[in-house]
Regions:
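N-terminal accessory targeting/assembly segments
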Residues: 1-114, 118
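Extended, highly charged alpha-helical segments
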Residues: 106, 117-180
Length: 180
C-alpha cells in the first residue's frame, strides 16, 4: 500500500512598495498595489504590509527615498524576531540593476520588481517544452541589461599566453555571450 506524504510548502512573506507621483495618483497606486498583491499571492507569497511614498519621481539610486527605505528596514528588523520574517520586498515598477543592488544592500532581503514577479509566475505555470523555452528566453532578455556590475568583484579572466590573446573577457562579457 502506498503512503502519501502531505508536504506543507512554506509561504514566503513579502512587503510591497509603490510610489504616488504627479503622473500616478493615490487611487491608481492603490489599484496597482492590489494587483501586485494578487500577483504575489499567485506566486505563493503572502503580503504582510504595503508601503507607499509620495514623490515627484523615482530615485535613480534606490527608487524610493532614504527615509522610506529606513522605514522599511525598521519594519523588516521588527519582523525578523517573529515566527514568520519577511523574505522579500516587491516593487510595483521595473527596477534597474543599480537600484536592486542598492536596495538589497540596505534591506538584506530578496528584491523583486513587477516584471520579475510576472516572469516567475509564467515560469511556474509553463507546462509544455515550448512554453518553458519561451519563458526562459524572456527571463534571459530581462536579465541581460541587469548583469552590469553584478560581477564587479571579478577581474578579467585570463586570456592565454602572452602575445597570443588580449587580456581576456570579463565575467560580464562571458555572461552576456552565454545568454545571447
Amino acid at each position: 500500500m502506498k503512503e502519501f506524504v502531505i508536504s506543507e510548502t512554506k509561504v514566503e512573506t513579502a512587503v510591497i512598495v509603490g510610489l504616488i507621483t504627479p503622473q500616478q495618483n493615490e487611487r491608481k497606486t492603490t489599484e496597482y498595489l492590489n494587483e501586485l498583491e494578487f500577483l504575489a499571492d499567485t506566486a505563493g507569497a503572502k503580503v504582510v504590509r504595503r508601503f507607499t511614498q509620495r514623490v515627484n519621481g523615482p530615485s535613480s539610486v534606490t527608487y524610493i527615498g532614504s527615509g522610506k527605505l529606513e522605514e522599511i528596514a525598521a519594519f523588516l528588523k521588527q519582523k525578523e524576531d517573529e515566527e514568520d520574517p519577511v523574505g522579500m520586498v516587491i516593487f510595483d515598477d521595473e527596477l534597474s540593476a543599480k537600484q536592486i543592488r542598492n536596495i538589497e544592500k540596505a534591506l538584506q532581503v530578496k528584491i523583486l520588481d513587477r516584471t520579475s514577479l510576472i516572469l516567475d509566475i509564467f515560469a511556474m505555470r509553463a507546462q509544455t517544452a515550448a512554453a518553458k523555452t519561451q519563458v526562459e528566453l524572456a527571463q534571459y532578455r530581462y536579465m541581460l541589461p541587469r548583469l552590469t556590475r553584478l560581477w564587479t568583484h571579478l577581474e578579467r579572466q585570463r586570456g592565454g599566453s602572452v602575445g597570443l590573446r588580449g587580456p581576456g573577457e570579463t565575467q560580464l562579457e562571458m555572461d552576456q555571450r552565454i545568454i545571447r
